[in-house]
C-alpha cells in the first residue's frame, strides 16, 4: 500500500444529504443546543424563505461545511457542528450572496441579504442546466443530417434526438455544460480570435481531452455545432439569461447537507460507496470509499480525515489514457499547460462493499490480451460456449481489515458491479459489449479459484418463440423468424432483481437505448436467455410526447420494478415487466411492450428548439432508495441531476418531485449514489444519502483553478 496524498482544503467534495424531521431546519431554530448555529435571514422585504445558509470552516483536516434551508419566516438552524470557527453566509435565487459572518457553535445570527441588481447578476448562481437550455438545437425537419456540403449536420445524425443525445451523453460525459467555464470560456480571451466560432473551434481541441471532444463534434457536424455553440455564447455575452429556478419548497426546505473534502483538482473520484447496498445498516459511521483513475480515496466522516492510496496491479502497467482523456494534447490545456499528470493506467471505475468488509473494485490489473483459458479452445464452460479474446478492465478488492489489495482476473470486461441476494453472494458485472459476467464469491472464497468461480453469457433473445435458445443470428444480420437473435452493445449499468433473481443491464446506444433482462437458468451458459426492452420511441402506438431516449443507469425497487434515467430526453422511467403482453417471439425486439413503461419528465427547462422531450439536464445515473436511507420513504427512485446541481427524488405514489439542490460550490456533477443508516433510532440524524463531486474537470467548479 502506498499513500500518495492526504487531502486538505482543495479539490473535490463528498456530500451527505438527509431530509430532516417534519418540522424542518427553519422551524427548529428555537432549539437550544451548543453545537448549533441558528438565526434568521432578512432582506428589506422581511424574512427570506427557501434560501440556503452555508456554514464552513477550514479548522478541520478537510474542508467541512453544512448547508440548510430557511423556513417560511426566514429562520434557520445549522445543527450538530464540530467545534470550530465558521464563516456563515447565505445564497438564494434572486439575491446576491450575503457577507460572511464569523460564528461558532452556540451563536445566533441575523444575516442581512439584498436582491440582485440585475437579472444577469441574479443568474450567476443558477444551475448549469438553466444556462444550457439557452442553446438552440437544429429543428426536427433538418434531420437526417446532410453533411458538410449540405446543412452541416453529420450524416449519422438520423433525427433530432440523436443530436440532443450527443449534447448530453457526449458533451457532458466528463463535466457540466452551461457552467461558467463552458458558457463564457473565461480561461481564454475570445477577443484574441477572429470570431466566437474560431474561439470554440480552439476550445474543443485543448488539453488531453481535446481529441475526444474534437471527434465528438465531427460526428455531430462540426461546422453546425460550432455555429450553435458560438451563438449561445454570444447571446449570453449580450445579456440573455435563463428563467429563474424555483426556490426550495415544502419538504425541500427540510434538507440538511454535510460536505467534506476529498480527492483533489487532478485525481477525480468516479463513484463512491458507503455500505452494502443489500443492507444499508452495515458499517455505521465508517469511512466512505471512492475510486477513480489509479487511486482509492478513503474519507472518515467522523474524524474528517481523507487519504488517497495508489492501487496496485497484478502485472506492471504502462502509462495510458482512459475513456476521458489521452496521454498527450495537441494544444496545451489553458489551465494546466503540459503539466497535468497522465498516469491513469489502472482505470479504476466503480466500488461496491460486500457483507464481509471487502471493497470490490472494477479496475485494470493486467494488459488487455486475455489468457488462453478465456479464448477459443479452452475447456472453461463459458469460454467453450462464447470465447473472449480481450478484456480492458478486470476486478480487485480492498480488504478493509488487512489493508491490502487482492486482484481477480476476469475474461469479460468490467464496468459496474452489483451483488445478488443469493446463497452464492454472486457478484454481477457489466462492461462487455457481448456478454454479462459473474463471480461466485462464495466459491471463490472456498477455493481461491478465480477461473472456476466465474462465468458469462451472451445476450441472445428468443425471437423464434420456442422458449429456449437455439441457432441464432449475429448482430447486424437480418432477423430470421426461425432463429433467435444475439444482441451486442456496451453493457453499461447492471442490477440483479431481488424478486425473481433475473439480471438487468442498460445499453445506452443506439438511440433510444435499451434495458436487457437475462435469465441465467439451471445450466448456464447454455440456459441463459435474454429479453430486450426499449423506451417508447418512434413507436406509432405511442404519442410522441411520451417517447424517451438515452437510458444510462439502472436500478430496481423491492417490488421488482426497474428504474432507468433517460439522460437524453430527460426522464426517470419505470419498467414493469409484469404488464407486458409479449415477452418473446419475432416481435420481441425492443418496442413490443410500451405498456410496461412509465416516463416521468424531470424538473427543469427544455433545450431551445426541441420538438419532443429534450431536457437541458443530464442524468448520469440513477439509484433507488430501497430502505428509506434518505427519509422520503422506501423505494424512492433518485435521478442524478448531473447538470442541475441536484439529486432528483421522485415520490412514485404521487409523481411529485423533490429537488435536493446543492447550491455551493456550483458544479455538483454526480455519478453514483449510496445510502447508509448509521443509527436507525436517531431519526434523520442517523441516515443519509452520499454523493460526490465527480467531474473529470474539478477545476471547472466554483472556486476551482
Cite the ranges covered by each PLM segment:
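Short, ordered, surface-exposed loop/turn motifs in non-cytosolic proteins
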Residues: 35-37, 43-59, 63, 83, ...
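Short Pro-Gly-centered beta-turn/loop motif in secreted/extracellular proteins
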Residues: 48, 77-85, 93
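A short, solvent-exposed loop/turn motif at the edges and junctions
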Residues: 57-63, 85, 89-104
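Short, acidic Ser/Thr/Gly-rich low-complexity loop/linker segments typical of extracellular
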Residues: 58-80
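The canonical Cys-X-X-Cys-His
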Residues: 168-179, 229
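Short, conserved, GDST-rich strand-edge loop motifs in beta-rich repeat architectures
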Residues: 181-188, 361-391, 433-459, 505-516, ...
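Structural signature of eukaryotic scaffold interfaces centered on beta-propeller domains
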Residues: 264-284, 338-356, 416-424, 483-500, ...
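Conserved beta-propeller blade signature
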Residues: 287-290, 297, 358-362, 426-430, ...
Amino acid at each position: 500500500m502506498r499513500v500518495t496524498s492526504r487531502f486538505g482544503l482543495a479539490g473535490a467534495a463528498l456530500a451527505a444529504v438527509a431530509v430532516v424531521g417534519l418540522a424542518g431546519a427553519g422551524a427548529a431554530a428555537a432549539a437550544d443546543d451548543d453545537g448549533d448555529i441558528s438565526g434568521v435571514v432578512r432582506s428589506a422585504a422581511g424574512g427570506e424563505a427557501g434560501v440556503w445558509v452555508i456554514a464552513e470552516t477550514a479548522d478541520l483536516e478537510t474542508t467541512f461545511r453544512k448547508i440548510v434551508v430557511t423556513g417560511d419566516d426566514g429562520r434557520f438552524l445549522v445543527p450538530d457542528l464540530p467545534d470550530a470557527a465558521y464563516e456563515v453566509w447565505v445564497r438564494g435565487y434572486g439575491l446576491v450572496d450575503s457577507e460572511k459572518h464569523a460564528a461558532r457553535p452556540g451563536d445566533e445570527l441575523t444575516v442581512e441579504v439584498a436582491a440582485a441588481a440585475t437579472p444577469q447578476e441574479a443568474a450567476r448562481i443558477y444551475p448549469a442546466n438553466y444556462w444550457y437550455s439557452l442553446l438552440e438545437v437544429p429543428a426536427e425537419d433538418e434531420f437526417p443530417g446532410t453533411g458538410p456540403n449540405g446543412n452541416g449536420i453529420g450524416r449519422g445524425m438520423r433525427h433530432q434526438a440523436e443530436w440532443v443525445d450527443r449534447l448530453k451523453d457526449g458533451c457532458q460525459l466528463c463535466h457540466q455544460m452551461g457552467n461558467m467555464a463552458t458558457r463564457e470560456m473565461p480561461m481564454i480571451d475570445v477577443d484574441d480570435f477572429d470570431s466566437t466560432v474560431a474561439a470554440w473551434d480552439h476550445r474543443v481541441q485543448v488539453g488531453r481531452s481535446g481529441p475526444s471532444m474534437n471527434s465528438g463534434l465531427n460526428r455531430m457536424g462540426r461546422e453546425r455545432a460550432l455555429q450553435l455553440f458560438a451563438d449561445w455564447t454570444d447571446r449570453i455575452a449580450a445579456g440573455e439569461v435563463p428563467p429563474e429556478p424555483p426556490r426550495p419548497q415544502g419538504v425541500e426546505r427540510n434538507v440538511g447537507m454535510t460536505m467534506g473534502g476529498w480527492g483533489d483538482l487532478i485525481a477525480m473520484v468516479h463513484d463512491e460507496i458507503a455500505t452494502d447496498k443489500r443492507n444499508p445498516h452495515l458499517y455505521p459511521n465508517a469511512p466512505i470509499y471512492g475510486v477513480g483513475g489509479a487511486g482509492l480515496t478513503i474519507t472518515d466522516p467522523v474524524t474528517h480525515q481523507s487519504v488517497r492510496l495508489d492501487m496496485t496491479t497484478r502485472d506492471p502497467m504502462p502509462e495510458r489514457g482512459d475513456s476521458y482523456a489521452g496521454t498527450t494534447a495537441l494544444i496545451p490545456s489553458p489551465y494546466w499547460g503540459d503539466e497535468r499528470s497522465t498516469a491513469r493506467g489502472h482505470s479504476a471505475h466503480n466500488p461496491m462493499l460486500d457483507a464481509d468488509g471487502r471493497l470490490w473494485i472494477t479496475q485494470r490489473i493486467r494488459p488487455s490480451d486475455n489468457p488462453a483459458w478465456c479464448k477459443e479452445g479452452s475447456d472453461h464452460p463459458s469460454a467453450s460456449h462464447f470465447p473472449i479474446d480481450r478484456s480492458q478492465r478486470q476486478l480487485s478488492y480492498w480488504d478493509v481489515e488487512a489493508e491490502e489489495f487482492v486482484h481477480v482476473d476476469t475474461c469479460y470486461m468490467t464496468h459496474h458491479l452489483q451483488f445478488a441476494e443469493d446463497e452464492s453472494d454472486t457478484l454481477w458485472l457489466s462492461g462487455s459489449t457481448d456478454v454479462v459476467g459473474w463471480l461466485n464469491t462464495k466459491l471463490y472464497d472456498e477455493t481461491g479459484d478465480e477461473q472456476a468461480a466465474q462465468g458469462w453469457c451472451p445476450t441472445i433473445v428468443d425471437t423464434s418463440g420456442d422458449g429456449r435458445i437455439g441457432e441464432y443470428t449475429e448482430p447486424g444480420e437480418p432477423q430470421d423468424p426461425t432463429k433467435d437473435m444475439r444482441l451486442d452493445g456496451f453493457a453499461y449499468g447492471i442490477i440483479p432483481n431481488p424478486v425473481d433473481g433475473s439480471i438487468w443491464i442498460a445499453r445506452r446506444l443506439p438511440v433510444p437505448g435499451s434495458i436487457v433482462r437475462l435469465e441465467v437458468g439451471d445450466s448456464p451458459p447454455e440456459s441463459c436467455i435474454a429479453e430486450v426492452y426499449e423506451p417508447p420511441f418512434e413507436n406509432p402506438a405511442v404519442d410522441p410526447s411520451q417517447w424517451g431516449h438515452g437510458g444510462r443507469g439502472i436500478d430496481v425497487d423491492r417490488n421488482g420494478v426497474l428504474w432507468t434515467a433517460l439522460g437524453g430526453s430527460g426522464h426517470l422511467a419505470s419498467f414493469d415487466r409484469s404488464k407486458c403482453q409479449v415477452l418473446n417471439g419475432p416481435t420481441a425486439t425492443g418496442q413490443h411492450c410500451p405498456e410496461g413503461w412509465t416516463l416521468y419528465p424531470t424538473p427543469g427547462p427544455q433545450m431551445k428548439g426541441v420538438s419532443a422531450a429534450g431536457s437541458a439536464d443530464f442524468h448520469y445515473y440513477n439509484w433507488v432508495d430501497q430502505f428509506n436511507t434518505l427519509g422520503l420513504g422506501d423505494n424512492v427512485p433518485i435521478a442524478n441531476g448531473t447538470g442541475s446541481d441536484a439529486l432528483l427524488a421522485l415520490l412514485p405514489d404521487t409523481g411529485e418531485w423533490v429537488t435536493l439542490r446543492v447550491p455551493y460550490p456550483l458544479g455538483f456533477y454526480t455519478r453514483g449514489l449510496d445510502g447508509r443508516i448509521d443509527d436507525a433510532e436517531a431519526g434523520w440524524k442517523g441516515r443519509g444519502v452520499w454523493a460526490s463531486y465527480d467531474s473529470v474537470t474539478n477545476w471547472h467548479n466554483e472556486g476551482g483553478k
